[in-house]
Amino acid sequence: MPRTIAKPSTISEGINRRFLEAIEAIVSLGKVSALEAFCTLYDLSAPRYREMRLTYGVSPKPGYQSRYKNIEVEAIYSLVVNYPISSRWLITGRGKMLIE
């Protein structure tokens, strides 16, 4: 039986993109040194998020489709609890990314 590959919803794609945008922001703010460091700190799979960055990142690789379709809940939790990132912005795209 062929494997069915589900296409992520536009909601999931938006959250994926905003998550990776937020990671870039905390790196540029000096809160964490790189995506890999964030993953190490919170026991996440760096290869997973590097691959997702090729599809959903700030500068995606044209035509590349990640095997991973969604950001893990643990990654979202770690981002909004430990950094000045708005959970409302991350989930809905409304408001500002950074919390003052």
Q: Model regions: which residues?
A:
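A short, Lys/Arg-rich alpha-helix, primarily the initiator
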Residues: 1-41
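Recognition helix of helix-turn-helix/homeodomain-like DNA-binding domains
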Residues: 40-71
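DNA major-groove recognition helix of helix-turn-helix/homeodomain DNA-binding modules
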Residues: 65-89
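Short, charged recognition helix plus adjacent turn
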Residues: 1-10, 81, 87-100
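Short amphipathic helical patch at the helix-1/turn junction of helix-turn-helix
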Residues: 28-29, 54, 70, 81
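Helix N-cap/coil-helix junction residues
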Residues: 31-32, 44, 58, 85
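DNA-binding alpha-helical recognition surfaces that contact promoter or target DNA
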Residues: 21, 51, 92
